[in-house]
Structures are given as structure tokens and as C-alpha cells.
Amino acid sequence: MADVEDVRAFALTLERAYEVFVRGRRKFRVGSLVFVAFSDDEETIEFGFPKDERDGLIASDPDTFSLPAPSDLRFNWVRARMDRLDPVEARELVVEAWRMCVPQKVARAWDEAHPDGP
């Protein structure tokens, strides 16, 4: 099971990433772009994910993944239950969400420094 503190510690290692609290919710940003957000109770994580791929992700494991709230459907977001994610999968999703917010050269530098992934 993925743990909020593990996700937090990992997210903060990513270049340009920082943590904020918005209306009591823990979020991680690059600049003004949010790439990860937790629910109020921190039982679900929402993360950036390409819109054209999210139906496939959700279909692959509907007990874990779901669409975001209707008000967020216009954004590149997917929601996941923390109790269904393993720590490695959570880190991979966080990196991919972060990648959507940083310049390509920053993402490439991370890839070069971490050839085996997170």
C-alpha cells in the first residue's frame, strides 16, 4: 500500500517541485501547475495523466483508478485509491505527472540520472 508520507518525500525530491496546502488539501506543484493532490482524508490521490490515456488506465484496474470529480474532467487528471497502489506504482505515477509540468530538458536530466526509473 502506498503511503502519503512516502509519496510526499519522493515528490519533494523532484526538481522544481514544492508542497502547498489549498483549503486543507495537500498538493504538489511545479510553478503554478499542480501535478499531485490528495483528498482531504488523504485516502485518494489525484495526479496529472494524459486525457487520451486515462480511459485505458481506469479500465485496467477500475477498483484502483477513477475519473476525477466532474468539475475536474476538463483537466488531465485521474484519481486513485491509496490503499490499492503499491509504493513503486505510486512513485511512477508521480514522476509521470511531474513530467507533464516541467520543461523537457528537466525531465530528460531526471531520466539520465535515474535510468531504472523511480
Segments and roles (model prediction):
Residues 1-118:
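Charge-dense, helix-prone N-terminal extensions
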